[in-house]
Structures are given as structure tokens and as C-alpha cells.
Amino acid sequence: MLSHATFWAPPVWLLILLTGIGAAQSRALEHDMLASHNAVRARVGVAPLTWSDRLTARAQDWADTLLARRKFDHRPNSHYGENLFEIAGASASPAQVVEAWAAESRNYDYKSTHCRGVCGHYTQIVWGGTKEVGCAVARGGGLEIWVCNYDPPGNWAGQRPY
């Protein structure tokens, strides 16, 4: 005969197991995102970023909000830099997300500080004054929305990123 405690033990262990899996996935995302950002920064001789749990929580909140609203916009009145990435019907790795932003480097003219097309995601990644990054992803309904926050923010008009 099963005791009451035995009956309830499996759900507790399942919860602990799932929490451990989620934490491991979170650490992997943190590692891969930070490594990818710092690889791009190293290409231009900019000091590496450090990971911020505070910025990550903010990024997760905004990614979840965007997914729930089915909207893709920057957070209004933010005091942080922000990069967004959206993909539908597929999944992206942290390295693919960062490399998509980094590919904008071809649109950036360092001498004039002007972009030919979009380059703000790239310049935020390599902004020399930025010290911390925190990123998150929200998934659902065939969509992935990635958000990275940067502190201090970059992309000041007329200034070179490094």
C-alpha cells in the first residue's frame, strides 16, 4: 500500500527536475549570449561585457510582454540600450541572434559614424562604454522574441562606438 507521502513525492521530484533543467538552459543561454557578444567586441578590440541578472530579468519581462501582445517594439522610455530579434516558424541559437546583429557592421562607416541602412544593433554590441548585458527569449505560438539590454546604453548620435 502506498503512503500519502509516497503518492505526493513524484510531483515534487518532477518539479525539482524541471527547475534544474530550466536553470541549466538559462545558464547555457547566458554563456552562449555573453560569449557571442564578446567575440564580436573582440573583433574590434573592445573590452568584454559582463552578464547582468538585473538586465536579464528586464529583458525577460519585455520579451514576454512582446510575445503576449504579438507586437515587436522597443520598450518605451528605457534607460538601457536594447536589441530585439524575432523569428517565426523556426528557432535561433544565441550565436545566430548575435551574428544577425553583427552582420550590420557592413552598413556602418566608422569614419563618418553613419549607417547605410540598419546598423544600430551592431553598434550597440560594440559600444565601448557599455559594460553589462542581459538577454532573454520568449517562445510561443511559433514565434521567438529575443531581447538584450545594455548598460550603459550606446548609440549616441555622432559618436563612434569605439
Regions found by a protein language model. Give the residues of each.
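Bacterial N-terminal signal peptides that target proteins for export
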Residues: 1-12
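Short, well-ordered surface patches within globular domains
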Residues: 23-81
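Bacterial N-terminal signal peptides
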Residues: 10-20
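Membrane-interface soluble catalytic domains
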Residues: 2, 26, 155-159
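Disulfide-stabilized extracellular recognition modules
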Residues: 80, 90-162
